């Protein structure tokens, strides 16, 4: 997730000049998980989040169609830049969490994204929200989530979850997912990738 200060830094990074390097942004970290593992872990966490409306009150897309269409427009623009490594590998779905007091967004492995209403209402421009969304998309695409969770919870624990076990730990991880602390390197890579996604789009 993003702290208030990080949100401002990400928004500011939108105005950095676009790089001429057309290569897809990549992570320099070591990740022992497969792409399928990322997707399975993300799916289990998403199911846990959806089953916990007290902590994560998800807006119903059928009742808040305009809000979801707004996110769809931004997300599709970023996903279709040709600069993601796992554009066709991951799920890339998004849910809106009703909490006007929280200025945050976060992303689970495999492209499961969550945005708080507080953040959407706080940001004045669509380009600002696009910058934050790009940052979270980058965390998933560069596979920072499983890299960081491996550091925090251990490889064996995450593999048990992928294989369908350790339900108690799934609950714990899901409850703390919005507070996941990425390394400084991960945050820098996500910032740079977000800027790369935004270049040559309507948000440039």
Task: Locate each region found by the language model.
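N-terminal leader-region detector that preferentially activates on the first domain or presequence
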Residues: 8-9
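Bacterial N-terminal signal peptides that target proteins for export
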Residues: 1-5
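C-terminal motif of bacterial Sec signal peptides marking the signal peptidase cleavage site
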Residues: 13-17
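Peri-catalytic and regulatory segments of divalent metal-dependent proteins
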Residues: 20-137, 141-153, 200-201
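Metalloprotease/metallohydrolase-associated module, dominated by Zn2+-dependent proteases
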Residues: 36-39, 166-204
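Post-HEXXH active-site segment of zinc metalloproteases
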Residues: 145-175
């Amino acid at each position: 997730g993003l702290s208030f200060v990080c949100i401002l830094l990400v928004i500011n990074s939108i105005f950095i000049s676009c790089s001429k390097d057309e290569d897809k942004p990549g992570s320099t970290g070591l990740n022992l998980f497969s792409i399928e593992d990322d997707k399975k872990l993300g799916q289990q966490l998403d199911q846990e989040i959806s089953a916990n409306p007290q902590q994560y009150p998800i807006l119903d897309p059928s009742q808040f169609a305009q809000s979801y269409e707004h996110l769809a427009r931004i997300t599709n623009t970023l996903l279709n830049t040709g600069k993601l490594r796992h554009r066709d590998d991951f799920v890339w779905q998004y849910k809106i969490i009703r909490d006007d007091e929280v200025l945050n967004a976060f992303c689970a492995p495999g492209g499961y994204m969550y945005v708080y209403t507080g953040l959407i209402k706080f940001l004045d421009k669509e380009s600002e929200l696009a910058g934050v969304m790009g940052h979270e998309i980058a965390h998933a695409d560069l596979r920072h989530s499983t890299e960081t969770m491996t550091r925090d919870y251990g490889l064996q624990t995450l593999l048990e979850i992928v294989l369908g076990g350790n339900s108690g730990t799934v609950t714990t991880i899901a409850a703390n997912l919005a507070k996941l602390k990425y390394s400084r390197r991960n945050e820098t890579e996500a910032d740079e990738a977000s800027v790369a996604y935004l270049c040559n789009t309507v948000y440039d």
